[in-house]
Every structure is written in C-alpha cells, then in structure tokens.
C-alpha cells in the first residue's frame, strides 16, 4: 500500500512487486497480534516476542488481511516522529455597519491534525511512511493574546490542550471538553507509538 510508483514501473518490476505482495500476505498468516494502538483513523498492530516489539503493520481497515498492509520490522525503522499540523483561524463578528471585525478580546480557532512519520530502511518500495491518527480535525478555541500576538494565543491553546499551565497568561480556551479530550488522546497515542518503536529498535 505504501508503494506509489506503479505507473512508471516496468513489467519486471511489477512482477517483483506482486511477488513481494504475495510473500507479505503469507507473513500475515504467521503474524501474531500482541497489541493495537490507535483510536480514530489508522491503527498500528504490533507483534511481540517475549514482550519486545518485533514487527508491525498500519491499517485503517478491520479486514486488514484483504488490504494486505506491509509488515515492517521495528529494526528497520530509522526514525519515528509526531507531526502535529495546525491551521489557525481568527473568529470574527459583524459590527453595527455589517463589517466583519475582530472580537474584543480576540478569539481564535486552532485546527489540529496528528500524524506519525517514519523513515524506513531495507524495503525496495518505500523509505518513509506517514499516517494520520485523528479521524477528523481537532478544533480548540482560545480567547485573548499572549503579549498581544496571534501566535501567543495559539500557543496557549496548545498548552491547555495538553493540560499545561498558562498561569499569568491573558488567554484561556473555551470549555470544549470533547475536543480537549480528543487532543490528549491523540497525543498519548503518538507517544505510545514512538515508545513502541524505541522498544523495538533496541
């Protein structure tokens, strides 16, 4: 599934890819799922031997054998990082003249998407993978600025999203417990994936 250069492949390369897919499907028959990490979008299935992570695959489908996702050895993971992509949006309101103006104090929405990015070696078809953790965008709202700046308000929203203190800062996030909870859950999922990779690389 991570192989994306089929259009430019030769007949021989396509045959090699099909043989690779067939061998991967056979490996699934011998893959023992020890645990699963994920909640909304993609799930990481991990095989362990004596409590040590050895292999994994990533899929969003419950019928994963039909998809035949690539089985990857943890020893072949060069790096694993969490990538939180944020899109900031100022919330505005209409004034008496019907113009859209900033609120006082200013209000913002911060849209978050969590991704895991891995560098992979010893695979002829891909050298990196990236998959999304949250199923839909996580939106946190903040009001007020830190030091009078937009970026400061966004930063405070992020801090509060993960439960960090913003004491003394003139900002707070609105009480959207479900979105704050989703943010924290996705952050913890990413931490567990990173830890599994570290444990498997040892």
Regions found by a protein language model. Name each.
Residues 80-202:
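Acidic, Ser/Thr- and proline-rich intrinsically disordered linker/docking segments
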Residues 53, 72, 111-113:
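Short connector loops at helix/strand junctions that flank enzyme active sites
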Residues 39-43, 76-78, 102:
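Short small/polar-residue motifs
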Residues 31, 35-37, 72, 129-131:
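Generic detection of short hydrophobic beta-strand segments and adjacent strand-loop junctions
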Residues 1-2, 77:
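Intrinsic structural disorder
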Residues 2-67:
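Anionic N-terminal interaction surfaces
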Residues 66-79:
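Short coil-to-beta-strand transition motifs
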């Amino acid at each position: 599934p991570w192989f994306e250069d089929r259009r430019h492949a030769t007949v021989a390369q396509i045959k090699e890819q099909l043989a690779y897919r067939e061998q991967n499907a056979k490996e699934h028959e011998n893959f023992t799922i020890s645990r699963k990490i994920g909640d909304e979008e993609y799930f990481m299935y991990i095989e362990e031997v004596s409590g040590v992570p050895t292999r994994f695959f990533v899929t969003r489908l419950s019928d994963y054998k039909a998809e035949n996702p690539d089985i990857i050895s943890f020893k072949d993971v060069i790096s694993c990082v969490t990538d939180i992509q944020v899109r900031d949006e100022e919330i505005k309101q209409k004034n008496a003249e019907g113009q859209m103006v900033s609120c006082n104090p200013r209000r913002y929405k911060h849209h978050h998407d969590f991704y895991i990015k891995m560098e992979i070696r010893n695979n002829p078809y891909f050298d990196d993978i990236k998959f999304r953790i949250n199923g839909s965008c996580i939106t946190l709202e903040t009001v007020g600025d830190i030091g009078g700046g937009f970026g400061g308000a966004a930063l405070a929203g992020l801090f509060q999203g993960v439960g960090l203190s913003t004491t003394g800062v003139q900002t707070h996030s609105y009480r959207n417990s479900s979105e704050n909870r989703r943010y924290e859950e996705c952050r913890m999922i990413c931490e567990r994936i990173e830890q599994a990779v570290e444990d498997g690389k040892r």
